[in-house]
């Protein structure tokens, strides 16, 4: 058995031990149903590289362990994400009067529009999460989507939700490493990625794989997490913000916008458009749900979401998880996860306020036609 197949087998077995076969639960009900010893192991795997060190050797270890680290990260945070954010694990712009769910859907529709996705096209979703964007985009366009993910638990959930929503004839979700895609060359009409390829050890590696499986003339559209031109890695405050984002979001290294742009060009893409959608004069910033400022709430329906994601809501969640962990209802290490997510929230808001970071650097790129 190859090394990659052995890793997949081991991850699948661990996922079954940790989560069981019940994918219908979410949020706290899912958290308290975990295998306690397996959850403790999963937390340890996730946090083992996050010891406060930001030197080159620490970065190298995180980059080398990207697959296992990302798999472990989503094993421990998926339930928290669904509880706080829903099934689309990404940020979006907000317009006055627009609900949270409408904002998220519009953000996904916009990317589908930029990718030129049409009815019955075969599309690849790179880093598909639990399939929220894929379900929305398939409904919007009528396309067929294959979602690629390295986390078995999220794949199980994505396939369950697709069947629940009667979209299983249009959607499928498969296990794979986006640095070593196993699809045939020139397979997909378009490819998109939403805040996922930031988990790659290098942009060039993942973009090169996307280029390979995309048909000639096809479009790749991505919302990329990058540090902006205002970021100075030699500035301790800036590096602290980047590290908080890396720690709380399971990212081995935050790269610059230049790194993403250069990687796209180097692997052969023609960049058609680039636009930092976070660099705007919007009255409501993209990081509004994390601030705890109630002036940003647009509708009564959003009160619960904004509470869960606000500073107060996150503190409440941490307190509740602390109690659950002490009572033995939540696995040991659950509080460490909420603390890491809190660090991420602090870093994301600071990075957004100072315009050092963007979660929505839009690149639209084309694979040239064959001559």
From Swiss-Prot:
One of its GO terms (cellular component) is endoplasmic reticulum. Pathway: Steroid metabolism; ergosterol biosynthesis; ergosterol from zymosterol: step 1/5. GO terms for biological process: ergosterol biosynthetic process; methylation. It comes from Kluyveromyces lactis (strain ATCC 8585 / CBS 2359 / DSM 70799 / NBRC 1267 / NRRL Y-1140 / WM37). One of its GO terms (molecular function) is sterol 24-C-methyltransferase activity. This is Sterol 24-C-methyltransferase. Belongs to the class I-like SAM-binding methyltransferase superfamily. Erg6/SMT family. Gene3D superfamilies: Vaccinia Virus protein VP39. The keyword S-adenosyl-L-methionine applies. Its EC number is 2.1.1.41. Keywords: Lipid biosynthesis, Lipid metabolism, Methyltransferase, S-adenosyl-L-methionine, Steroid biosynthesis, Steroid metabolism, Sterol biosynthesis, Sterol metabolism, Transferase. It catalyses: zymosterol + S-adenosyl-L-methionine = fecosterol + S-adenosyl-L-homocysteine + H(+).
